Amino acid sequence: MSAPQDGEAGFVLLSVLAIFIVVGAVLAAAILQVRSATGLAQARADAVRLQGAADGIARLVAYELDLGRVYRRPGPGLPEDGTVTACPLAPGRTALLSLQDQGLLVDLNATPRPAMEEAFRLLGIPDREVLALAAEIVDYRDPDDVPEPNGGAELPQYRARLLPWGPRNAPFASIDEVDRLPSMTPAIAARLRPVLTVYNQGGRFDLAALVRRANPAAIRSLPGSAGPVPSPRQAFRLSVVVEEGRSRAGRSAILDLGGSGFVVWQQTVAPDLVAGTGHPACAAVAASLAAGP
């Protein structure tokens, strides 16, 4: 073969190789795209299944609580003080549940100031902050513009603290609003949040039970008059997280057994549900999901 023919053959070979490289790159990109789409679809399907399980568990617990109230029979048996329960489901899948009776908590709208002050002291809040916070809570929720004695705060006091907002002068809509109080700090808020609610309409609570759970070291400081106060067991905060591998889905709800049903139904993974202990009630939870995905 002559030199020109050799050169032409070499050029053709290089052209064919270039085409193969381009086609291979396109195919590789397409395969990666398909795999990525498949993985994304699988992740979405897993998330939907986990969310369905979380929602089903939340509705099951609510149903059992409602039956217990109507027919005066035992409910699901889960702890009602916010303790986290861990329930094994299918292999590799776990449900974390937390049930909190709101009638055991300090109500920002209904609990009288003296009762709030007593509870806050026993929870370890310094006396000066106790007086200010209790007064600010009352001023935030009451309709008038007259500051409470010993630390109250109406609009002028908020302005003096360089805060761009003032008191609502109406009931707290959620416990998150305590962050707006002039004397509230992140450390105090973290200590108080677990014992606060806006769903204990009667305002009364069992001080001894509250302190025993939130600050056991202060049990000996309880006043002799701190007798048991039964909860009306009407409102509950219910949080469920279902996890499998690295995937997690959750549901948080407020259940009113007085006839309103779910007054809050939020798709969220509660940050405090990361570990828990087993409980006999888990058997019923697992059985209810046995036929599910």
Show where each model-derived region lies.
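Compositionally biased linear targeting/interaction segments
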Residues: 2, 9-293
